[in-house]
């Protein structure tokens, strides 16, 4: 299920929903700001004082304690430092949370999300887990998205409100799926960024600035993302001999490694990919397509 989030005027989303936001770091503050500006009655709480001042000026109510905040909201949004922080704050408040809906957008692992969902179920709390695919400045703007899993009823009930933050994607009742998808997407992002850093380091000794390299890398890498669906079709089909693919032998990255070394820079990022390629070549699959490195990752040695 996917919806297109927007913030068109006040009272957007679910009318008459009282919301409490626990955690006013950069992300929590951004989430709360969107809710307040949309006209929702919003109570906010943060461990350290002062962070609520700007939100209070916009119309939010600052709670003196986390318990006060929880008791003030039908919907409780938690955006804290980590999984341990969530339990530290919420465990003493399980009774107050009973009968309410908890949306946890704290960064957690899939297993931690499932554990928290089980804790919530035992306490009579409706649980929805969220993975935010945006930086704080993007919340409520085009390009922002939030991945959800957990209670389908909670997602349907509060979907209009959740859409205020960005496009809402729901992945099912397994509370860990949103986190898993979130981390998988971040894995792709960080490997891509590492590739950019590798390239920028390689050309730097030749007097090329990172900014100049970026102006060429961005359109090139954007164009290359068109291959994702082609690779996906090969992976899902399980046949790496399909014609039209670049072979693993042709994809050998020895020249890139040599060039990087000649420039006097590290080549760890490329060496990682080369290792995935060589494993398949050494196993006798050199004439098969590049997508086969998926098997090096899917079934590690």
Locate each region found by the language model.
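Rossmann-fold NAD(P) dinucleotide-binding segment
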Residues: 66-126
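NAD(P)+-binding Rossmann beta1-loop-alpha1 motif at the extreme N-terminus of oxidoreductases
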Residues: 2-78, 136
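Helical "substrate-binding/catalytic lid" subdomain
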Residues: 177-300
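Rossmann-fold dinucleotide-binding core
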Residues: 108-190
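Hydrophobic beta-strand scaffold residues
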Residues: 42, 62, 126-128, 169, ...
């Amino acid at each position: 299920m996917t919806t297109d989030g927007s913030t068109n005027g006040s009272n957007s989303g679910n009318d008459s929903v009282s919301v409490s936001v626990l955690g006013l770091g950069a992300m929590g503050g951004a989430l709360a700001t969107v809710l307040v500006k949309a006209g929702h009655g919003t109570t906010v709480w943060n461990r350290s004082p002062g962070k609520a001042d700007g939100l209070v000026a916009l119309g939010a109510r600052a709670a003196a304690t986390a318990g006060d905040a929880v008791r003030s909201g039908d919907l409780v949004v938690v955006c804290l430092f980590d999984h341990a922080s969530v339990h530290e704050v919420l465990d003493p408040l399980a009774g107050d949370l009973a009968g309410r809906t908890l949306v946890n957008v704290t960064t957690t692992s899939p297993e931690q999300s499932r554990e928290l969902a089980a804790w919530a179920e035992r306490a009579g709390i409706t649980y929805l887990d969220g993975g935010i695919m945006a930086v704080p400045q993007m919340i409520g703007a085009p390009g922002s998205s939030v991945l959800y899993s957990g209670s389908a009823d909670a997602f349907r009930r509060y979907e209009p409100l959740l859409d205020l933050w960005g496009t809402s994607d729901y992945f099912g009742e397994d509370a860990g799926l949103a986190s898993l998808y979130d981390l998988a997407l971040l894995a792709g992002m960080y490997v891509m960024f590492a590739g950019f850093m590798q390239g920028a380091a390689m050309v730097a000794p030749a007097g090329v600035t990172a900014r100049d390299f970026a102006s060429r890398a961005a359109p090139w890498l954007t164009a290359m993302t068109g291959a994702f669906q082609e690779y996906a079709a090969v992976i899902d089909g399980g046949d790496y001999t399909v014609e039209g693919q670049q072979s693993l032998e042709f994809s050998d990255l020895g020249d890139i490694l040599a060039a990087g070394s000649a420039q006097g820079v590290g080549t760890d990022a490329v060496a990682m990919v080369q290792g995935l390629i060589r494993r398949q070549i050494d196993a006798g699959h050199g004439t098969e397509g590049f997508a086969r490195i998926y098997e090096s990752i899917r079934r590690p040695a």
